C-alpha cells in the first residue's frame, strides 16, 4: 500500500512542477507576442516612411552615372 501512496505523491509532485513550467512558458509566450507586435509596428512605420520619400529626391537609374570601370 505504501508504494501506491509513494507513486501518488510522486505524480502529484511531477504535476506541480509541470504546472509551474507551463506557467513560466506561458509568460514567455506573452512576452514574445508583445515583442513581435512592437516589431511589426516598427516595420510598418519604416515601410510607410520609405513610401513617403519623394521620388524627385532620388535619381532614376538612367540619370545615374555609370561606375568608372564602364
From Swiss-Prot:
Record-linked InterPro entries: SlyX (IPR007236)
Organism annotation: Shewanella frigidimarina (strain NCIMB 400)
Record-given protein name: Protein SlyX homolog
Annotated family: Belongs to the SlyX family.
Encoding gene per record: slyX
